[in-house]
Swiss-Prot record:
Role noted for this protein: Allows the formation of correctly charged Asn-tRNA(Asn) or Gln-tRNA(Gln) through the transamidation of misacylated Asp-tRNA(Asn) or Glu-tRNA(Gln) in organisms which lack either or both of asparaginyl-tRNA or glutaminyl-tRNA synthetases. The reaction takes place in the presence of glutamine and ATP through an activated phospho-Asp-tRNA(Asn) or phospho-Glu-tRNA(Gln).
MF GO annotations: asparaginyl-tRNA synthase (glutamine-hydrolyzing) activity; ATP binding; glutaminyl-tRNA synthase (glutamine-hydrolyzing) activity
Class of this enzyme: ligase
Cited HAMAP family: GatB (MF_00121)
InterPro entries, sorted: Asn/Gln-tRNA_amidoTrfase_suB/E (IPR017959), Asn/Gln-tRNA_Trfase_suB/E_cat (IPR006075), Asn/Gln_amidotransferase (IPR018027), Asn/Gln_tRNA_amidoTrase-B-like (IPR003789), GatB (IPR004413), GatB_C_1 (IPR042114), GatB_Yqey_C_2 (IPR023168), Gln-tRNA_amidoTrfase_suB_CS (IPR017958)
Provenance organism: Desulfovibrio desulfuricans (strain ATCC 27774 / DSM 6949 / MB)
Keyword annotations from UniProtKB, A to Z: ATP-binding, Ligase, Nucleotide-binding, Protein biosynthesis
This protein's name: Aspartyl/glutamyl-tRNA(Asn/Gln) amidotransferase subunit B
Enzyme Commission code: 6.3.5.-
Amino acid sequence: MAVYEAVIGLEVHVQLATASKLFCSCPTTFGQPPNSNVCEVCSGMPGSLPVPNGQAIHFATLVGLATGCTINPRSIFARKNYFYPDLPAGYQISQFELPICEHGHLDIEVDGVCKRVGITRIHMENDAGKNIHAQGENISYVDLNRAGTPLVEIVSDPDMRSAAEAVAYLKDLYAIVTYLGVCDGNMEEGSFRCDANVSLRPVGAKEFGTRTELKNLNSFRNVQRAIECEMARQQDLLDDGEKVVQETRLYDAVKNITASMRSKEEAHDYRYFPDPDILPIEISDSDMERWKAELPELPKARAARFVEMTGLPAAEVEVLVQSRGLADFFESAAGLSDARKAANFMLGPLLRECNSRGVNAADPAAWNMKPEALAELVRIVDQGLISSKIANDIFGDLFETGVMPERYVKEKGLVQISDSSALEEAVDAVIAANPAEVEAYRGGKTKLISFFVGQIMRATKGKANPALVNELLAKKLS
């Protein structure tokens, strides 16, 4: 039986976070009443003329710069001709022979192994509308609110060899476009979705096998499962001596199967030609330099710097850079306190509070707690004003109210007892109340020290300085 390897390429559709559509002034707001964000241009009325959105061109260029692409100073819009009810003009405005960006790459890591995935091209295009199939009715409706929304399609080289590599590539790309602020990243609303081209070939073969395209995968989990499912389907066909048919397939997440949708089109089927209504897009040298200067530090570079700052494992630091807002929050707090301790508070109690309260961990701007408050919490623990246990106990209140920690602990009477004479009284009382445990401790059961510490902490309502308690106990029990 032959051993096969997968050949996978992704076509990722990124909805650009512009206020208006690609060729008209209609808003791109999601969730509006059907056909309310529509005009003559995006509804494909004869005689209407498209005007390119400058912000979309800017955003597309930023994506190209962030992925190491060559930016073409001159690019051309083309008409992609096909019929579908949600495509009112009978063609999609896309780019073909001369896209805005070409020849980029993304470096991914899977199981500690780094790999470079090439990016063939990035081109701009307008989105189609949406067909709504009424349940129980023999009728379909068309909502054109989405028609004309600006997209960039990021086409990878067929360099991935497993579903895990495809997901790693997709997650890295997602991090980049959300860091850049060019996409809101809402996969449920279709802002970031992909098509996967999957084929199998014998290991060591140079030629590609027959590929199938899996359409409109809108979650990382579904991408992983759909590719694995399709690989298994093709493997079964080839093992049985059958041929894989080139076609477009849909993934059914409930049944975990892929089903045939239609035969796969080639580029010539769309009869591309330059759009006669739109002049070539030209990017000036001054615009290019200005946009290059706008590029933020990207997630991988920032993660590497945070590892150096904190000494934490890369896997933990990756959580801190999962969104630009979260990374900015950490950077602000770390600049005012011990970076590693600030990171530990964020990775522990802070994310715990986000999860328990259903708060978006990627959007610190919506939190009541500010970076200055987290930094102050780190500092007052370091100064001995409160113990780390108290800090963890009060974190929920601090997160909810946004009050500064030092003020909070003083108002609540939670300041740590670090006066040895005051603590000595509590230590003596606990020793006097537990003679059997004292005798056992002195007889060699030294683990009982934690029992004594616990009793003292209970007596002082958690306010005793643990280090000083241990020191006093060691002296009095010896």
